[in-house]
């Protein structure tokens, strides 16, 4: 299955994490509602929510990808260069989610403004992005794993994201900076990046793509050997640092749940 990007044991973990996302969405309402997942990927979370009785809708920028996801899952998946191009009705959704998507948007403020329009009064937005003011971002600087240039166009601290949401008419109801899915690994790969010449060696191992790629710098044997030698101690240090950073609200990932206020705050 070409849609599976990672090694099988990682794919199983991803499926479980998508179920956990569905759990977090389900807790926002007493009864299932209508959800839009912007940048829905393979539609794993939406499929699980559909199984639980939600009306699930997704978006992807690529028309071909949107069609393929829709064919595979049976979900309606819209495509367009911007969210506005999808032409959703005002107040159409109870919940809109963006999981590691907002940082890819050319105009995140306009995206949030459009979300405010299509969310019902009292509805929710869930946004998860890398945390620019995290310990791992500060430790990694230019080799921070989640920096991911040029794919990431913007980065936010927790306070910046909260302020931006408030300006577009959303009141924060929950915020935290620990992600079991992305936080410890992000710290681990960032620390390894400080040791190796080539970045993201471990991440490239875990993907199903070839380690040597025309689109990535070649792996040097010293980087491979250093990663193998250091992976266990660095992982232990990374987990400790990431858990500690989250205690001080400086974890690698920030997730905010916010409720629509009307009109703009």
Regions found by a protein language model. Name each.
Residues 10-13, 77, 188-190:
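Generic preference for hydrophobic/aromatic residues in regular secondary structure cores
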Residues 14-17, 250:
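Hydrophobic (often cysteine-bearing) scaffold residues that line and stabilize catalytic clefts
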Residues 10-15, 226, 230:
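Short acidic-aromatic active-site loops that bind/stabilize oxyanions
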Residues 1-8:
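Active-site hotspot residues in diverse enzymes, especially metal/ion-binding acidic/histidine motifs
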Residues 17-143, 150-170, 255-261:
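Conserved SAM-binding loop
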Residues 84, 106-114, 124-261:
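S-adenosyl-L-methionine-dependent methyltransferase catalytic module, highlighting the catalytic core
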Residues 264-265:
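Membrane-interface junctions at the ends of membrane-embedded or membrane-associated helices
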């Amino acid at each position: 299955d070409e849609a599976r990007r990672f090694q099988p044991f990682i794919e199983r973990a991803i499926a479980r994490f998508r179920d956990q996302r569905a759990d977090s969405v389900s807790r926002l309402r007493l009864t299932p509602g209508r959800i839009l997942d912007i940048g829905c990927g393979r539609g794993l979370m939406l499929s699980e929510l559909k199984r639980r009785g939600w009306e699930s809708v997704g978006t992807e920028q690529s028309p071909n990808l949107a069609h393929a996801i829709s064919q595979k899952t049976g979900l309606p998946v819209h495509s367009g260069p911007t969210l506005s191009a999808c032409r959703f009705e005002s107040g159409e959704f109870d919940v809109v989610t963006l999981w590691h998507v907002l940082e890819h948007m050319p105009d995140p403020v306009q995206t949030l403004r459009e979300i405010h329009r299509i969310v019902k009064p009292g509805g929710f937005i869930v946004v998860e992005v890398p945390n620019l003011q995290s310990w791992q971002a500060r430790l990694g600087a230019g080799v921070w794993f989640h920096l991911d240039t040029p794919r990431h166009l913007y980065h936010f601290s927790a306070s910046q994201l909260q302020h931006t949401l408030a300006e577009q008419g959303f009141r924060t109801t929950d915020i935290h900076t620990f992600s079991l899915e992305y936080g410890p690994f992000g710290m681990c790969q960032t620390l390894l990046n400080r040791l190796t010449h080539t970045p993201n060696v471990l991440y490239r191992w875990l993907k199903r793509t070839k380690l040597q790629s025309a689109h990535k710098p070649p792996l040097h044997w010293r980087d491979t050997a250093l990663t193998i030698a250091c992976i266990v101690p660095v992982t232990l240090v990374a987990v400790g640092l990431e858990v500690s950073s989250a205690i001080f609200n400086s974890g690698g990932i920030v997730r905010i749940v916010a409720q629509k206020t009307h009109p703009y705050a």
